[in-house]
């Protein structure tokens, strides 16, 4: 656990006090975004000259002056959901790179950090927090095989809230990319991380601050339960989706998206809408971090979890795989992660008159430990 006094800060310092939103809950609802884009050129998901335009995880842009090459780029940021700045930096890196992993790209030409310091920080708080955030971001980049990838930090801005994120850029050939548009009836839907990370983080903060919601958790759960759930979430949220992206190529995945602020069903629907064929994504399993469903029920927030709409930060990839490849993918994924991460077959793809994603009535909830 982060101990602020060891860094010269007040013992009661909490980074999460410098924001009113946490993690990817800072996103406006998907339908609101669609309303703003409606009737504009930005709305078009397949603009001329773009393989991927608005609405998906990252931009894939053919380079007109360099035929055979494409620019892959994403910009993403969020607000603190943990009090440990170094841990926040690690989660931020995983979250930023995930958008590019969703199209099967695993090499980066540059990664740029986006950082803003809160206007409410003292000079000492700013020096400690920003330094540790940068350390976590950079160390995670190096530890995951990107020691030679340039990390750029152009400027540090002042903002009412502390913001952390980045820009990931890759220039590659078309064979390195898995476009998110080729789902086929009969495909199996695989999810590479459990849901519930954001709620696990929230519960940890309730515990720290002894809130009314924390007292509700104690009616059926212990402090040890909250700690265990938080640790599972940290393990999941700091893990990069790199191995999943590599296995997408090995098993000829048809498309993928990463699960963040719009929730599983929101991102699944967005992916379904992007397909060349009219398809229905039918989700019949929801893998959720241990205790999270119980936590959400105790504090009256279970509806979003039971409907597949819980906000996620640094979530897994939702991948459409040929039916005969799904079991092999899951076995290889567990082996590639040394058994420390799990993937889940959560549904299937069928032909449809209109593309959509739905949660089956008899959905199965799977409690996940890592």
UniProtKB/Swiss-Prot annotation:
It catalyses: hydrogenselenide + ATP + H2O = selenophosphate + AMP + phosphate + 2 H(+). First expressed in the midgut anlagen with subsequent expression in a variety of tissues including the gut and nervous system. It comes from the Eukaryota. Its cofactor is Mg(2+). One of its GO terms (molecular function) is selenide, water dikinase activity. Synthesizes selenophosphate from selenide and ATP. GO terms for cellular component: cytoplasm. Homodimer. It is an enzyme of class 2 (transferase). This is Selenide, water dikinase 2. It comes from Drosophila melanogaster (Fruit fly). The active site is at residue 24. Belongs to the selenophosphate synthase 1 family. Class I subfamily.
């Amino acid at each position: 656990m982060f101990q602020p006094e060891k860094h010269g800060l007040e013992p009661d310092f909490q980074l999460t006090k410098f924001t009113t939103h946490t993690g990817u809950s800072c996103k406006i609802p998907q339908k609101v975004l669609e309303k703003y884009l409606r009737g504009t050129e930005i709305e078009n998901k397949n603009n001329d000259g773009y393989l991927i335009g608005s609405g998906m995880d990252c931009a894939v842009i053919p380079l007109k002056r360099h035929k055979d090459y494409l620019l892959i780029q994403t910009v993403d940021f969020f607000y603190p959901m943990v009090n440990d700045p170094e841990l926040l930096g690690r989660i931020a890196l995983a979250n930023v790179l995930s958008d590019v992993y969703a199209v099967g790209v695993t090499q980066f030409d540059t990664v740029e950090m986006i950082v803003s310091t809160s206007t409410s920080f003292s000079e000492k708080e700013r020096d400690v927090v920003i330094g540790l955030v940068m350390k976590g971001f950079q160390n995670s980049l190096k530890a995951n095989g990107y020691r030679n990838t340039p990390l750029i930090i152009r400027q540090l801005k002042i903002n009412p809230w502390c913001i952390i994120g980045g820009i990931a850029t890759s220039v590659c050939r078309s064979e390195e990319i898995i476009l998110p548009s080729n789902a086929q009836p009969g495909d199996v839907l695989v999810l590479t991380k459990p849901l519930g990370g954001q709620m696990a983080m929230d519960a940890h903060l309730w515990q720290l601050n002894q809130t009314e919601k924390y007292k509700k958790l104690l009616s059926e759960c212990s402090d040890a339960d909250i700690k265990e759930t938080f640790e599972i979430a940290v393990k999941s949220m700091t893990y990069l989706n790199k191995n999943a992206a590599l296995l997408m190529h090995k098993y000829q995945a048809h498309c993928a998206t990463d699960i963040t602020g719009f929730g599983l069903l929101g991102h699944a629907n967005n992916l379904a809408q992007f397909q060349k064929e009219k398809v229905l994504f039918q989700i019949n399993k929801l893998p959720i971090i241990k205790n999270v469903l119980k936590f959400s029920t105790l504090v009256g927030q279970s509806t979003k979890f039971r409907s597949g709409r819980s906000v996620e930060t640094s979530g897994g990839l939702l991948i459409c795989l040929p039916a005969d490849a799904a079991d092999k993918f899951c076995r290889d994924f567990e082996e590639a992660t040394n058994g420390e991460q799990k993937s889940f077959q959560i549904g299937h793809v069928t032909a449809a008159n209109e593309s959509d994603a739905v949660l089956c009535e008899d959905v199965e909830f799977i409690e996940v430990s890592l």
